[in-house]
Each structure stands twice: as structure tokens, then as C-alpha cells.
Amino acid sequence: MKTLWKHCHIASMAHGKYSIIENAAIVTSGALIEWIGPETELAEPEHDNCIDLGGAWVTPGLIDCHTHTVFGGNRSGEFEQRLQGVSYAEIAAAGGGIASTVRATRAASEDELYASAERRLRHLLKDGVTTVEMKSGYGLDLENERKILRVIRRLGNTQPVTVRATCLAAHALPPEYADRAADYINHICNDMLPALAAEGLVDAVDAFCEYLAFSPAQVEQVFISAGQLALPVKLHAEQLSSLGGSSLAAHYKALSADHLEFMTEDDAVAMAAAGTVAVLLPGAFYFLRETQLPPMEALRKHGVPIAISTDLNPGTSPGLSLRLMLNMACTLFRMTPEEALAGVTFNAAKALGMSATHGSLEVGKVADFVAWDIERPADLAYWLGGDLDKRIVRHGVESSI
């Protein structure tokens, strides 16, 4: 079915720029874009439907390329404790922190995890998100990592959103492997990844490279195993210290390296050469009251693509609005609104290996877009909170969220 979407202005985000088309129209055929351009250049079309967008600004559907949406439990009590002066170490010693989320996730049924994740996902969808990545990493054994990944697949099959599933078994050390990190990494590589990949539950593999998680050498083992399974890799790197994780990610042609507050210019050079995307997570930076900024000038100087994401998770970034992250990226990291919008469209698609089909409005790409009732594209990064009036189109069909 062909649909003409007319009377709009378009920020197509082609090549990662606004790439504005004034007084524009889009023709979709099924789930794909068949034509896009100034309305005056549109030949008399044959179409089944004609939809007037009322002068709206149209952007690609937003892409949240780094989330931990599926988890059990609630850590708002820890948030309150920290603000009362209890240290993270004290909370962890009492069984809190990520360990509490692992316990709650293991205890939850698949249906319970689905129900709670679906509620969180709905907030993202209402913000204009049409594609989202979700990670495992709160199960930390084969049974529970499988359970999380099954929930992620189920969300993609039942909700009006494209979902990419990432296995983050190398997120933290589970209690049964205390002081045995090498054994756990071997278990991930020899048992968990092959089984989960064989079941079709994994689109990419991630790890946490940090002094309080896994070493570069241990992460490299995971990357080698992922490569043997033909799975692309991603990496949490340089959030709290500089271990060279982002350069390691670049060496293995990772889709992305994420966080990056402590990365060096040499890391930026390596990432640029590899085409590895820098995924910045301003929500975690804000929530943890960090002070070490990502090296924005080095990223720009060397042409590293920059994406933005919510990092939605229970411990360090309980963020339910990707649009709020646009403002945070501009305010905290001094990104421009154009850079920030590219970070949740064009470059976010790159970070998921989806740039051939998603991330910009171009002929042949998937017809995922949002028609916003705004005065200019910068409004998306300008307004703090609220629910901007919008119409969301996914695969060429208007969604009601």
C-alpha cells in the first residue's frame, strides 16, 4: 500500500546532518520510503492514502541504542540511602547494588519481567522511539540470561518497536563465581554464548571493561568467542578509569564503545579508523554526578560518530526519556542540537549495525518517522520533559502508543 505524507518539513538526518527539506512530502510503499523531497517536485502520484501532516517537522524515528530495560526489582531505596550519606560500598556490602538486581531478576518469572519491562518500554515509545537495543546482564547464568533474552525477543514481537538483543553476560561476577572471574569468563565463552546464539536470542555481544568488572584480557576472550559465532561486539569502556577498552573494541571492529568519560585521544584515533561509534550516556553521567567529561573535541577532531542513549537501568540511569538525554547531551557535554539528534538517529543506527535500513529518511530505508508539532528541530533538545505533540509512524503505518 502506498501512502503520501504531505504538508511537512523534514530533517532527514542524511549523513548525520539535519539535511532539511522545506515544504516536503514522503511517499511510503509498504514499510519502505519510496520517495522523499519538496512537495512541488512530486509527480502526480498513485497512492492509496493521503495524509496531511499539518506543517509538522518530520524526523527519523528515534533509536535508543543502549538500554538495560529488562530487570527485576527496584533500587529507588538505594537512591534514597545514598542521598542520606550511605556509600555505594556500604550498600553493596549489605547485598545491594547490582547484586540485588541479579537476585530480583533471577527470582522473577518471564511473565513478570515482561510486564515490568513493557511498562518501561512504553515510556520510550511515547517519546518517539521506534528502535531500541536491550541488554541482558542481570541473570549472569545460562538459565537467567536466556530468560532475559527471551523477554527481549518477546517485546520485539509484541510491541510496535524494532528491538535488538545484546548478550551482556560479562556484566559482573555472579555470587557463585566469587573470586573466580577467569572461570566465569570461560563459562560465558564455552557454554553461555554458544547456547544462546544457537537459540537465535542474540544480535550482538557486550561486556563491561572496568577495574570493578572485567579486564581487557578477559573481555578479549569474550570478543574472540563472539567472533567465532559471527556475532558483532560492543563494549562498556572507560566509564570510571582508562584501561584501553575503547581501543580494544576498535581492534575487534566493535559496533560501539559506550560511556567513554576516561578515553584518550589515541582511543579516539583507533575508534575512528575502525568505524566504531562512541555511545555517550549523559543520564548515567548526571545520576552519578560524574565530573570527568568525555573528550568531545578529540571525538570531533578525529571524526568518531557520536550516539546518545538513555542507558535505562535500575542502578545508574533510570531514564525513561530519550528526548531528555538530548538536552543532557547538549547541556552537560556541549553537543549541538544537530549533533544530539544525529546521536539518536543516524549514528545510533550505526551503533546497532542498522545504518543501511534505519537512522535517516532516504529512499529505500524503513519508513520509521515522527511528525513533531515543533517550530524547529532544535526544539527536541531544548524542551525539558513533557510530552510533545507528535504522530509516530512505524513501517509506514501510524502507531497509537
Swiss-Prot record:
GO MF annotation terms: imidazolonepropionase activity; iron ion binding; zinc ion binding
A cellular-component GO term for this protein: cytoplasm
Listed pathway(s): Amino-acid degradation; L-histidine degradation into L-glutamate; N-formimidoyl-L-glutamate from L-histidine: step 3/3
Binding site for Fe(3+): H66, H68, H236, D311
Domain of life: Bacteria
UniProt-listed SUPFAM superfamilies: Composite domain of metallo-dependent hydrolases, Metallo-dependent hydrolases
GO term, biological process aspect, one: L-histidine catabolic process to glutamate and formate
Family note: Belongs to the metallo-dependent hydrolases superfamily. HutI family.
Role description: Catalyzes the hydrolytic cleavage of the carbon-nitrogen bond in imidazolone-5-propanoate to yield N-formimidoyl-L-glutamate. It is the third step in the universal histidine degradation pathway.
Protein name: Imidazolonepropionase
Organism: Pseudomonas savastanoi pv. phaseolicola (strain 1448A / Race 6)
Lineage: Bacteria, Pseudomonadati, Pseudomonadota, Gammaproteobacteria, Pseudomonadales
